[in-house]
Design a protein with these regions (language model features):
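N-terminal beta1-alpha1 ligand-phosphate binding loop
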Residues: 1-19
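Structural motif
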Residues: 6-10, 33-34, 54-55, 185
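Short, well-ordered alpha-helical microsegments
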Residues: 13-14, 39-40, 59-62
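A short, Lys/Arg-enriched amphipathic alpha-helix followed by its capping loop at the start of a domain
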Residues: 16-28
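N-terminal beta-loop-helix "entrance" segment that forms/cooperates
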Residues: 18-19, 36-48
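A short beta-strand-loop structural module common to alpha/beta enzyme folds
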Residues: 25-38
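Short, structured active-site "lid" loops
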Residues: 43-60
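Donor/substrate-binding cores of folate-linked one-carbon enzymes
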Residues: 56-180
Length: 187
């Protein structure tokens, strides 16, 4: 399958996705999401059968997600939306978290769900959790999603907050003030 990876950076997760998909025999190309024009150019040149976005901060242009299957790998549980998912999970001291593969649509992180899996959270830095649990889970979901797209018979699950397994919510970008630790003490 011709798979285009669109990423905000060629980070560890994107590199691992590249290597894993290549090892599975897929024809893989990568483009950085530098601008909507650069994304459109990469899509036109490569003509992918599937677009995977392992690490994306920007929106996919509508003229692309309307014509291609574009899957966003989101570091959050089903229903979780927003740019600071893992930050909020760590701050809220949740017991488990997850990764969701969802279809790109106009509303960020609100598309149909192609795959989702959870993992237990541990007491560690965001970077460590991202490099280990998030990356491992994301790679599994990307493999599952590629198989589902290739089958031509899989129907993704619409995001439905009425479902018991949809526990996430829309959260804002975490600001520095949200991360601060109270230093005031009483004498």
């Amino acid at each position: 399958m011709r798979i285009l990876l669109i990423s905000s950076a060629y980070n560890g997760l994107t590199q691992r996705a590249h290597v894993e998909l290549d090892a599975l025999g897929h024809e893989v190309s990568i483009t950085l999401a530098l601008s909507p024009a650069e994304i459109a150019k990469a899509v036109a040149l490569f003509e992918p059968e599937l677009i995977l976005c392992p690490f994306l901060r920007e929106k996919i242009p509508a003229d692309i997600w309307q014509h291609y299957t574009c899957i966003i790998i989101h570091p959050g549980i089903k229903g979780d939306r927003g740019p600071s998912s893992l930050d909020w999970a760590i701050t809220d001291n949740v017991k488990d978290w997850g990764v969701t593969a969802l279809q790109a649509i106009e509303e960020m992180d609100a598309g149909d769900i192609w795959a989702s899996a959870n993992f237990p959270m541990r007491s560690a830095s965001k970077a460590s959790i991202y490099r280990q649990e998030v990356t491992r889970t994301a790679i599994t979901l990307m493999r599952d999603t590629v198989e589902r797209v290739a089958s031509g018979t899989f129907t993704p699950e619409p995001l439905d907050y009425a479902q018991d397994d949809v526990r996430g919510t829309l959260r804002p970008l975490m600001r520095q003030t949200d991360r601060s630790i109270g230093t005031a003490t009483r004498l």
